[in-house]
Amino acid sequence: MGAFIGEIIALSMMALALGMDAFSVALGMGLLRLRLRQMFYIGLTIGLFHILMPLAGMAVGRLLSREFGSVATYAGGALLLWLGGQMIIASFRRDDGSPLFPRGVGLLFFAFSVSLDSFSVGLSLGIFGARTMVTILLFGLFSMVLTWVGLFVGRHFQQWLGSYSEALGGSILLAFGLKLLFL
């Protein structure tokens, strides 16, 4: 039971880290003054993609783990290190490009692009044999809720909080990568 609770805590922290990426992007999208119905669909779509992408990643990760064993374990840890580092670096860059309007194909493209990193984390978790259902439900729930929160507070705090939330998420993934490689 203690191991299960520990796994839920670790997976929740990873879900928080991945959700912070969606949160930081949603902060900027909150400036578009979207309707509540649009915000609901945006959060729901991002949550769904944060279920599907790590699910696909976990399937590939389990296959790699069976085929390559301990080499895949180190690759999974290195992947988390790389992804965390990329998130931290991205948090310090300024991207003034025009945002996609979050409707129709634009929303699907947006949700896909925000959830790409959850595929990579799912790949690592698949290598380590994490519980699939718990993982995808936590990832989907955290990203959906954090997207909604980001959309709501985006008008007020985007300039201050945006890069810090992505840096925090990257730091969490970086820490897990170090843990997997060295502990």
From Swiss-Prot:
* GO function terms (MF aspect): manganese ion transmembrane transporter activity
Ion transport: is it a keyword of this entry?
A: yes
Cellular-component GO terms for this entry: plasma membrane
UniProt-annotated location(s): Cell membrane
> What protein family does this chain belong to?
Belongs to the MntP (TC 9.B.29) family.
Organism ancestry:
Bacteria, Bacillati, Bacillota, Bacilli, Bacillales
How does the entry describe its membrane topology?
Multi-pass membrane protein
Q: Name one Pfam family in it.
A: Mntp
Signal peptide start and end residues:
none
State the source organism's domain of life: Bacteria
Sorted alphabetically, the keyword list is: Cell membrane, Ion transport, Manganese, Membrane, Transmembrane, Transmembrane helix, Transport
- Sorted alphabetically, which HAMAP family does this protein's record hold? MntP_pump
Tell me the protein's name.
Answer: Putative manganese efflux pump MntP
Keyword Cell membrane part of the UniProt annotation: yes
Q: Which residues cross the membrane?
A: 8-28, 40-60, 72-92, 108-128, 133-153, 163-183
This molecule's function is given as: Probably functions as a manganese efflux pump.
